[in-house]
Amino acid sequence: MADSGTAGGAALAAPAPGPGSGGPGPRVYFQSPPGAAGEGPGGADDEGPVRRQGKVTVKYDRKELRKRLNLEEWILEQLTRLYDCQEEEIPELEIDVDELLDMESDDARAARVKELLVDCYKPTEAFISGLLDKIRGMQKLSTPQKK
């Protein structure tokens, strides 16, 4: 199971806690390879593991991420209805919300979405107007430029 040659370091399994301890069972710990992050010039840091905030939530507001996730779930739900199929069977199309937010007007946005849904045999007007309502006021999630 453990391969010390992997980029993430070796995985070490600790024995399960004794009976009656209420512990969850065996735990897996990852050991960094020599010279990995966390080791300074003076050797290994003795401070123990440091919990870091995820990269995505550092760059973006959690509230905006939640709004975007809810929007994506809504889009998937609507597309399964429009194409009358399961999520896995939806034709390959990408509705890029950031691209839509970059456009000057709702008319341009609507035209772009209509262009993407050209193969849909059901009416798309309700979906398009709902999508435009939902993205109104959203912020782009493009990667911020470093200075």
Curated annotation (Swiss-Prot):
The modification Phosphoserine is found at residues 21, 32. Ubiquitous. Expressed at low levels. The modification Phosphotyrosine is found at residue 29. Pfam families: PP1_inhibitor (PF05361). Phosphorylated primarily on Thr-57 by PKC (in vitro). An unknown Ser is also phosphorylated by PKC (in vitro). Residues 61-103 form a coiled coil. The modification N-acetylalanine is found at residue 2. GO terms for cellular component: cytoplasm. GO terms for molecular function: protein serine/threonine phosphatase inhibitor activity. Belongs to the PP1 inhibitor family. Inhibitor of PPP1CA. Has over 50-fold higher inhibitory activity when phosphorylated. PANTHER family: PROTEIN PHOSPHATASE 1 INHIBITOR POTENTIATED BY PROTEIN KINASE C, PROTEIN PHOSPHATASE 1 REGULATORY SUBUNIT 14B. This is Protein phosphatase 1 regulatory subunit 14B. It comes from Homo sapiens. The gene is PPP1R14B.
